[in-house]
C-alpha cells in the first residue's frame, strides 16, 4: 500500500511538472514542432537513467525507486501525447517535422537514458 501511495504522489508531481515545463516552452513562441512534449520526454529519459542508477548504487528503498521512476518519470513523460502529436504532424503533411520528431524522440530518448546512467555512475 505504501508503494502505491508513493507512486501516486510521484505521478501527480510528474504530471504537474510536465504541464509547467510544456507551458513554459510554448510561451516562447509558436511552431509546427511539438517542442514541449519533445523536451519533456527527453528530459524524462535522462532522469529515469539517473534515478535507476543512483537508487541502485546507494541502495535506496525500493518504494522510493518506484516513486521516482514509475511515479515521477511516468507522470512526467507521455507516450500517448507523443503519438497523437506525431499523427497530427503526419495528417497535416508536415513530413520533415513528423520524421524529425519520431526519430529524434527515439534516438535522443535512448541517448538520454545512457547520459543519465553515465552522469550517475
UniProtKB/Swiss-Prot annotation:
TM segment ranges? 5-25, 33-53, 66-83, 98-118
Tell me which species this is from. Answer: Phocaeicola vulgatus (strain ATCC 8482 / DSM 1447 / JCM 5826 / CCUG 4940 / NBRC 14291 / NCTC 11154)
Please report the name of this protein according to its UniProt entry: Fluoride-specific ion channel FluC
- Topology of the protein relative to the lipid bilayer: Multi-pass membrane protein
Give the subcellular location. Answer: Cell inner membrane
Function statement: Fluoride-specific ion channel. Important for reducing fluoride concentration in the cell, thus reducing its toxicity.
Q: Give the UniProt keywords, A-Z.
A: Cell inner membrane, Cell membrane, Ion channel, Ion transport, Membrane, Metal-binding, Sodium, Transmembrane, Transmembrane helix, Transport
Give the catalytic activity: fluoride(in) = fluoride(out)
Name the residues that bind Na(+).
74, 77
